[in-house]
């Protein structure tokens, strides 16, 4: 499974009336104008100004949906040493969803879980 970077783009809509957020998965992404980005060679033009562009390259390179992890030590009253869990979601804002139970920050996942060798 090829892992891509997750980018979050916040766009000003209707002259500041409200903001809209878009999430894009791509190997590379760059802003090339006040309202334009290029993602993996594809130009995307928004109707209004891009206010914010965030990336979780480190997180998405480390964890991905469907990945199996091994529990390093008992934690969170739900996971026991030696057991395996599945990454069900990697979200730029909420974190990494483990076994559909809880979203955790990357640092917590790094501490209590290890990647299985494939």
From Swiss-Prot:
Organism: Bacillus subtilis (strain 168)
Domain of life where this protein originates: Bacteria
Protein name: SPbeta prophage-derived uncharacterized protein YoqR
